[in-house]
Amino acid sequence: MSKTQTRSKPIVLLGSAGLALLLICLCAFSTNADAASVARSLIGLEQNAGRLEPRATTSNYSYQRMIANIGGASSTAGGNQVPGVQSGAVIASPSTAGPNYFYSWVRDAALTMKVVISQGTLDRTLVQNYANAEKVHQQNAASSSSGQGEPKFNPDGSLFTGPWGRPQNDSPALRASALIAFAKRIGLTDPFVTGTLYKSDLSAGSVIKTDLEWVSHHWQDSSFDLWEEVQGAHFFTLAVQRRALVDGAKFATSMSDPGAATYYNQQAAAVKTKLQTFWDSGNGYIQAYQGVSGRSGLDCSVMLGALKGWDTTNATAAVDATEFGPASDKVLATHKKYVDSFRSLYAINNNAAAPNAVATGRYQEDVYDGNGTSQGNPWFICTLAAAEVLNTAVSVANARGSLAVTSTSLPFYRQFSSSAAAGTYASGSSQFTTLTSGMKAMANGFVNIVQSHTQSNGSMNEEFNRNTGFNQGARDLTWSYAAFVSNDLASQGKYLVV
């Protein structure tokens, strides 16, 4: 296990040397969760406090730490942490032991590039280098039995051939959506688009076309989940596959490839039908997987699937129950049950009642501790996903000018107002204000939890310990930083462009 026991430096935050000494004793030397909680309370890191500046991670700092993990890139926060890596390759973490995450996962890379492409000023060179690196990955994956479902590659771009959970068919879908958004930003007639990204002739090996063809012909295949643990059918995988096919159909039409557009639309409709089967009406939440036993099905991957699988250009899609967007009643109902499942599970949560935010992990039954198996922990990406769903739902309500409460989502909304009832509340009404304000406060609570568990320099590992709050697992996880920036955009009423 790799565990970095680094906390904030209380003496910087406090004027009292005596109190600073007390905090050092509590934070640095105690493994007692209650003591750690008291320490956080004393230095103002309770979950309902305001934004934690300047010690805690900020969006710009997270973005720069994320960039530092890309081959050939240079950031203002640590330069480049992955020297010698293939240009444009996104490395999951600089950690090479305990655990070794020094690889380029297609999924992590695509999610990272979604954040890069969504910036106000586009770093075209960085994204082109990424696209070129992924083209090499595609070519190398062609020799694998998993094809474009090959999950990860060595730092030099060569195929990772060791034992692993294969295939992971969410990966090409995420990559396709990211690069379609990039193509739209630089212009569909740009030579890089027409030469590298999309050619209607599949034999030409263009990056987007290769992925869309793979997704459209293999979405029904059994696949490993995004956690790389279980094989079957997964909500997250299907959600992002459908998004890629919807994006791909529109893009193919624009690229004068009507036959492909028709086929992608047909397959997207079939995926949408399959997604409906994940709703568990008996338990009142979206199941994360099918064909997997021993789990409740409440899983962070559903939150991520809602965020990465909806059409961000269409606010109506965000509330449509059949679309499973982040503002839909079924996703919000699942959000409540997912968050509640961790309230008493982790000691650092102190069994806080709703509507308080708490640290969340992947799923209740998790035993991966960041390097081996013992007990699962809160993850930064999951706690941030819980925040981003709320921030996105509020943004959608503001954009639409109303908020709809159904019998399905009523328990979710009653966290914020005991008088909430099924119906539609117009923007400006007292109930609209009460509900959206409560959601924003809860979202800020999740972010404050994340910020209170970052290290003193603002860096984030993959996990933080369920009892002590210390960071552990892979250090400087690229996805953790991408998740922080993604949620920050949502909190400003912006969405990722992909």
Task: Please tell me what each predicted stretch does.
Residues 106, 139-170, 235-242, 254, ...:
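Extended ligand-binding clefts on enzyme/binding-domain cores
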Residues 100-218, 238, 484:
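Aromatic-rich carbohydrate-recognition surfaces in CAZymes
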Residues 143-144, 149-154, 369-382, 408-498:
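CBM-like carbohydrate-recognition segments
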Residues 91-98, 150-166, 216-233, 279-290, ...:
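Acidic/His metal-coordination segments adjacent to aromatic residues that form catalytic metal sites
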Residues 1-48:
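Fungal secretory targeting signals
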Residues 50-60, 117-131, 182-209, 249-272, ...:
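Structural helix-adjacent loops and short alpha-helical linkers that scaffold large soluble proteins
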Residues 36-104, 128-129, 133, 137-150, ...:
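Low-complexity, Ser/Thr/Pro/Gly-enriched N-terminal "stalk/linker" regions
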Residues 68-82, 136-140, 178-185, 210-221, ...:
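Glycine-rich, acidic and aromatic/proline-enriched surface loops and short helix-turn segments
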